[in-house]
C-alpha cells in the first residue's frame, strides 16, 4: 500500500513539474489577430486560465480575474478558449463584452488544452519562465467566485511574488 501511495505521489509531482510548450499561440477571440505568448519573456511568470464563453462558473470569475491582473501587473495573464462546442460568433461577442485586460486565444483544435491536460473551466496554471508548471488548479474554491471562501490562484501568486514556495500546487 505504501508503495502505491508513493507511486501516485511521485506521478502527480512529476506531472506538476513537467515541461510545457515554450509558448501558446493562436488567434485572438475578439479580432482574430495572431497572438503568441512566450513564457520566457514574462517578467515573473505567466498565468494561463482556460475560460468558456457559455459556462456560468467561468463567467462568474471574470471580474475576479480582472482584479487579479490589476493586483499582479508584473505577471503575464492569458486566457485560452478551447470549447469546440461554442461557435465563433458567440465566443467573439462574449469576450468583446467582458473586455478582459489580457489576451484571449482561440484554441480551435484544443491543442493547448491537450498540452496542459485542461478539461474544465475556469482552470488555471502558473508557468515559470523556465517552462515549469508552478501551480495547477481552480481559480477559487467555488463555482461562483463571489461565494468563494478560498482564493487558490491569488494565494499562489502571492507566494510566488513574495519569494515563497507555492503552498498549494
Q: What would you call each of these model-derived segments?
A:
Residues 38-59, 65, 157:
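Short active-site neighborhood of thiol/selenol oxidoreductases, capturing the structured segment around
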Residues 128-169:
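Thiol-/selenol-based redox modules, centered on thioredoxin-like
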Residues 95-128, 133-136:
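Short, internal strand/loop/helix patches
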Residues 59-98, 106-115:
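Structural microenvironment flanking redox-active thiols in thiol-disulfide oxidoreductases
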Residues 43-46, 73-76, 100-102, 129-130:
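Loop/turn elements at helix/coil->beta-strand transitions in domains of secreted/extracellular proteins
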Residues 15-18:
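Boundary at the C-terminal end of the N-terminal hydrophobic targeting segment
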Residues 24-46:
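A short beta-strand-turn-helix
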Residues 3-12:
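Sec-dependent N-terminal signal peptides
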